[in-house]
C-alpha cells in the first residue's frame, strides 16, 4: 500500500482477493444514453450535438485526404477519457486515467499505427516533416535530429500530460480534505467552499484533458497523410 496521500491511486486494493479497481474504467459504459429511443431526451440531443461537433472538427483537422470513418476511434477515445476522468471525481471510485499504465497503453499503439501508416504509404511526405521549410543547409542534419526526438516523445507527452493533471487535482483535494479535522467550524466553511470551487475546476480539467488528448491525436494523425 502506498502512503496515505497517494492511497487513492493505489491499484492493488482488492475485494474478495479480486482486484476490481481497473473495472472502474468501464463504468462509463453504464452511463452512455441510449441512441435508439423513439423520442430522444435533452441529454441525448446534447450528446449527439457534441459528437457531431467533434466529428466536424476532427474532419477539418484531418483534411480531405482522410478515410471515411477515421474520426470514429478519435471520438471514442475522447468519450472514454471523458467518462473515466469524471468517474474519478466521485468518492471511492478508482481514477484509471491517473496511471501511465492506461494512458501510455492507449497513446503508444495509436502513435505507432500513425507512424507505420505514414512511413509505409507516404514515405516522401514523412521525410519532409523532418526538415522544416526554409531551414539552412548547415542546420538540416541538426533539425532532423530535433524533429525525430520530438516525434518519438509524443506518446510519452500525451500519457504524462493526462496522468499528471489527474494526479495533481486529486492530490489538492486530498490535501484540503486532510486539513478538515484540525480546523474550527468557522474556518471549515471556507474549506468547504474552496473544495467546491476546486471540484468545479477539476470537472473542467477532466473535460479539457480528454479534449486535448483526442485533438493532439488528431493532429498527429493528420501529419501522415
From Swiss-Prot:
| Coiled-coil positions | none
User: Where would you say this protein principally sits, based on its record?
Assistant: mitochondrion
Q: Which Gene3D superfamilies match?
A: ATP synthase, F0 complex, subunit A (1.20.120.220)
Domain of life per record: Eukaryota
One Gene Ontology MF term: proton-transporting ATP synthase activity, rotational mechanism
Subcellular location per UniProt equals:
Mitochondrion inner membrane
Q: How does it sit in the membrane?
A: Multi-pass membrane protein
A GO cellular component annotation here is: proton-transporting ATP synthase complex
Q: How does it assemble?
A: F-type ATPases have 2 components, CF(1) - the catalytic core - and CF(0) - the membrane proton channel. CF(1) has five subunits: alpha(3), beta(3), gamma(1), delta(1), epsilon(1). CF(0) has three main subunits: a, b and c.
User: What's this protein's name?
Assistant: ATP synthase subunit a
Q: Which organism is it from?
A: Locusta migratoria
Amino acid at each position: 500500500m502506498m502512503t496515505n496521500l497517494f492511497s487513492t491511486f493505489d491499484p492493488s486494493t482488492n475485494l474478495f482477493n479480486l482486484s476490481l479497481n481497473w473495472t472502474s474504467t468501464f463504468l462509463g459504459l453504464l452511463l452512455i444514453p441510449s441512441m435508439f429511443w423513439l423520442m430522444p431526451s435533452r441529454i441525448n440531443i446534447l450528446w449527439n450535438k457534441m459528437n457531431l461537433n467533434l466529428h466536424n472538427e476532427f474532419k477539418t483537422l484531418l483534411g480531405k485526404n482522410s478515410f471515411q470513418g477515421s474520426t470514429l476511434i478519435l471520438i471514442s477515445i475522447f468519450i472514454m477519457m471523458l467518462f473515466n476522468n469524471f468517474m474519478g471525481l466521485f468518492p471511492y471510485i478508482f481514477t484509471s486515467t491517473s496511471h501511465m499504465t492506461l494512458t501510455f497503453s492507449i497513446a503508444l499503439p495509436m502513435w505507432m499505427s500513425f507512424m507505420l501508416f505514414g512511413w509505409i504509404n507516404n514515405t516522401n511526405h514523412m521525410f519532409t516533416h523532418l526538415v522544416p521549410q526554409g531551414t539552412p543547409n548547415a542546420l538540416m542534419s541538426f533539425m532532423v535530429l530535433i524533429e525525430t526526438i520530438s516525434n518519438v516523445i509524443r506518446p510519452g507527452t500525451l500519457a504524462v500530460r493526462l496522468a499528471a493533471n489527474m494526479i495533481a487535482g486529486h492530490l489538492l483535494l486530498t490535501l484540503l480534505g486532510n486539513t478538515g479535522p484540525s480546523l474550527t467550524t468557522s474556518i471549515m466553511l471556507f474549506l468547504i467552499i474552496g473544495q467546491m470551487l476546486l471540484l468545479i475546476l477539476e470537472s473542467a480539467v477532466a473535460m479539457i484533458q480528454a479534449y486535448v488528448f483526442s485533438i493532439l491525436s488528431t493532429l498527429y494523425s493528420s501529419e501522415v497523410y
